[in-house]
Regions:
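VWA/integrin I-like adhesion module and closely mimicked acidic/polar interface patches used
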Residues: 99-150, 156
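N-terminal-biased segments
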Residues: 72-80, 92-107, 111
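Short beta-strand-loop
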Residues: 6, 29-60, 80-83, 106-108, ...
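C-terminal helix of von Willebrand factor
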Residues: 147-175
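Helical mechanochemical/support elements of P-loop NTPase systems and associated helical scaffolds
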Residues: 6-9, 13-16, 50, 54, ...
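Von Willebrand factor
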Residues: 1-47, 71-75, 88-95, 131-140
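N-linked glycosylation sequons
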Residues: 66, 71-78, 85-86, 122-125, ...
């Protein structure tokens, strides 16, 4: 039951992000997608205005597995710095339960993964960006809130709600 509940929560979070993508399309914003699971983080979709490509990549995004959070935050910082050089401030949304358990060197360790993730979060917080951490855990987790606080971002526990309700919460939390 917990596995199917987690998949349902991920589906609702993806639905909310899809609604957010539609808003970005209307404003002609660029969007990018970074997946972080198992051994590494990967830029699946470089910054683009293509809503169709973004939706396809989001739909195919799997959940579960190990979490190389630091590497994902490093990629996010790199994109934020590039955006800053172009005179823009990047906004990002992170869907996570906050359980960083892969260190930068690839070691599977919750302690090292968390330490590396928080160090990467401190660096990202200094970039021209603003962020939102959506806690996808069944129950709100202190580690996801700590990540949001370190990022100087907004924390939002995934409510038991549909994508529309979550999208309204995201809109309220992001500029």
């Amino acid at each position: 039951a917990s596995g199917s509940a987690a998949l349902q929560r991920l589906a609702e979070a993806k639905g909310a992000v899809e609604l957010l993508l539609a808003d970005c399309y209307v404003r002609r914003d660029q969007v990018a997608l970074i997946a972080f699971r198992d051994e590494r983080a990967e830029l699946l979709l470089p910054p683009t205005r293509s809503l169709v490509r973004a939706k396809k990549m989001l739909a195919a995004l799997p959940g579960g597995g190990a979490t190389p959070m630091a590497e994902a935050l490093d990629l996010t910082r790199d994109m934020a710095e590039r955006a800053g050089k172009q005179g823009t401030t990047m906004q990002y949304v992170i869907l996570t339960d906050g359980a960083a358990n892969v260190a930068r060197d690839g070691t599977r360790s919750r302690e090292a993964g968390t330490a590396d993730a928080l160090a990467a979060a401190r660096m990202l917080a200094m970039s021209p960006s603003s962020g939102l951490v959506i806690d996808t855990a069944q129950r709100p987790q202190p580690r996801a809130r700590e990540l949001a606080d370190t990022l100087r971002g907004t924390y939002l526990a995934l409510p038991r709600a549909d994508a529309q309700t979550l999208n309204r919460a995201i809109r309220a939390a992001t500029p």
